[in-house]
Amino acid sequence: NRSFDLLGLSTLAVQITLAIASIGCCVAMALPLAHMVAHVSDLGYDYETGAQLLALMLATAGVSAFFGVGFFGKRYGGLKTIFIFSGIQGLFLFALIFADHLWMIYLVAIFFGLGYGGVLPCYPVIVREFLPASQVGRRTALVILCASGGMALGSWIGGALYDVTGSYSLAFIIGVGFNIFNLVIIGHLIHRNTRQKKAVLQGIASK
């Protein structure tokens, strides 16, 4: 059993864990993507500026997706790579709460884009590493389906809380909480994988 050998978990447990983790990161991811233009408008900047910031986020996300995941994934594996990108995403979502000057928002947009762009492409890598190769397509699709639900939930949370509070700050704080939830899950999987590798090496050394 590949998942048990590498993580000490059943195939189903790994599938469910990754699905839940994907919801956490994608709730956080969706908030700036869905509400950046409106948020910037609330800060006194025009819609054109908001659109430029959104375009900048998407452009830098493309850099991470096309180059960053391959670079880090080859060296550190899928779990550590997604931990890096999810950490960057969460950090700059938190920074967005306090960014009010335009240059600060541009800086946040660049680094948030670099972070979020590398998150979703890591899930197929992780599925391929830890789940049966013959089931990669189906299991990746299930994870991405849950991630899509997280995107929808994050977008809705942002709008619903804005209607109540008149600000996106609370929504961004909740998004950071979801991001931390994702990091805790991924960090736990990294810990389990490291422990399993040590156990295998100790078993080989004792023979």
Feature-to-residue mapping (PLM):
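Paired small-residue
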Residues: 92, 103-111
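Helix-to-loop junctions at the C-terminal end of transmembrane segments
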Residues: 64-77, 163
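A late C-terminal transmembrane helix in Major Facilitator Superfamily
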Residues: 130-167, 175
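Intracellular juxtamembrane helix-capping segments at the cytosolic ends
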Residues: 118-131
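Structural signature of the two symmetry-related core transmembrane helices
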Residues: 80-94
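Multi-pass alpha-helical transporter architecture, strongest
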Residues: 175-207
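Residue-level signature of mid-helix packing/kink "hotspots" within the transmembrane helices
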Residues: 58-66, 117, 148-152
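Extracytoplasmic gate region of multi-pass secondary transporters
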Residues: 10-69
